[in-house]
């Protein structure tokens, strides 16, 4: 049926994702990919993937928009590309159009992003883009 048989908080996450107009997912890069916490949450959508792609029953019918924000201490594009591919797969499962992304390399410490006004400006612009796209999805 596309729902996980494990009784934990993923059912709350599924409900929120079903109801949302937009989703911005953010994660740091650890060991060349998404954080373990982010990845395990995405892995819990495997039941939804099976439902949509094997059983042909889409439990995330509502169209939505989405974006991905990712930070890394390293300046490795391949790390970001790896994370992006995982997030794009999630967005396909939940019917979210991948509207944009923000990759912020060179960030090691908490608050360090404040030294990079270009990252802050890009994050603001991405937020405006996602809000506009979500508004366009709502019925008039």
Enumerate the predicted regions with their spans.
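Glycine- (often His-adjacent) and acidic-residue-rich active-site loop
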Residues: 1-3
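Helix-loop-strand module that forms the ligand-binding subsite of alpha/beta enzymes
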Residues: 5-92
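Glycine-rich phosphate/pyrophosphate-binding loop and the adjoining helix
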Residues: 88-140
């Amino acid at each position: 049926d596309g729902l996980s048989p494990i009784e934990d908080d993923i059912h709350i996450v599924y409900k929120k994702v079903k109801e949302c107009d937009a989703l911005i997912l953010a994660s740091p890069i650890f060991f060349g990919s998404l954080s373990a916490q982010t990845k395990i949450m995405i892995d819990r959508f495997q039941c939804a993937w099976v439902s949509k792609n094997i059983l042909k029953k889409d439990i995330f019918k509502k169209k939505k928009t989405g974006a991905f924000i990712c930070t890394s201490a390293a300046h490795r594009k391949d790390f970001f590309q790896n994370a992006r591919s995982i997030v794009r797969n999630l967005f396909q499962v939940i019917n979210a159009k991948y509207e944009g992304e923000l990759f912020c390399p060179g960030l090691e410490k908490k608050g360090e992003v404040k030294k990079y006004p270009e990252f802050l400006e890009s994050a603001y612009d991405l937020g405006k883009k996602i809000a506009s796209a979500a508004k366009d999805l709502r019925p008039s």
